[in-house]
Design a protein with these regions (language model features):
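Gly/Ala-rich phosphate-binding loop of Rossmann-like dinucleotide-binding domains
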Residues: 19, 23-24, 170
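FAD-binding core/adjacent interface of flavoenzyme oxidoreductases
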Residues: 1-9, 67-156
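Short beta-strand to alpha-helix junction loop
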Residues: 52-71, 160
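Glycine-rich flavin
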Residues: 37-39, 43-45, 49-59
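Glycine-rich Rossmann-fold phosphate-binding loop(s) that bind the pyrophosphate
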Residues: 10-14, 161-163
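Glycine-rich FAD pyrophosphate-binding loop
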Residues: 24-44
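Conserved small/polar residues in nucleotide/adenosyl-binding loops
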Residues: 173-174
Length: 175
């Protein structure tokens, strides 16, 4: 069993900020567990400006904002395990996880930060009718396809909703 002072579950904005702050506060035995193949979480698909003004004093895109935290971590001893799925967190602060590189592990921590972020609700959870709505994407899925994978989601696009993410998608769709 591996023992660490702090396990941070999630390598998105919350997890990265928590790791930087813990390091700045003097904690040295820190491990980030991230299920994706890269750090940054949702920020990686947010190519619009609007991040970093308070923390870094300038407007950054999501990937730029994540990159700043990742660069800050390179100057520390914070350890990172990518492509790692957390299976269970026990009341005794034991984190059960699995990855291709490390296999099944139990990591005992003095403290745990839950920084898993959020996921969009599924098609069923938001009440999209039908059994297979071809060409219907959530905003997050569309952002990922367009901004990260380089795919077009359609020649003609209809955006349903006028919240922040709908307006952001509209501005991205026009590029």
């Amino acid at each position: 069993m591996k023992n660490v002072d702090l396990v941070i579950i999630g390598g998105g904005p919350a997890g990265l900020a928590a790791a930087c702050k813990a390091w700045e506060s003097g904690l040295r035995d820190i491990l980030i567990l991230e299920r994706d193949k890269e750090l940054g979480g949702i920020l990686n698909q947010c190519i619009h400006n609007g991040f970093g003004l308070h923390r870094f004093g300038e407007q950054l895109t999501g990937p730029e904002y994540a990159g700043r935290f990742i660069e800050m971590l390179k100057d520390t001893g914070v350890k990172v395990q990518l492509d790692t799925m957390v299976l269970e967190v026990t009341p005794e602060k034991k984190v059960h996880c699995v990855s291709k590189e490390y296999g099944y592990q139990i990591i005992e921590a003095k403290s745990i930060v839950l920084g898993m972020g959020c996921r969009e609700r599924t098609r069923g959870a938001i009440g999209t009718p039908g059994t297979r709505p071809a060409g219907v994407y959530t905003a997050g899925a569309a952002q990922r396809y367009v901004n990260m994978e380089g795919y077009l989601v359609g020649k003609r696009v209809l955006i349903l909703g006028s919240g922040d993410i709908g307006l952001i998608m509209r501005s991205e769709e026009r590029r």
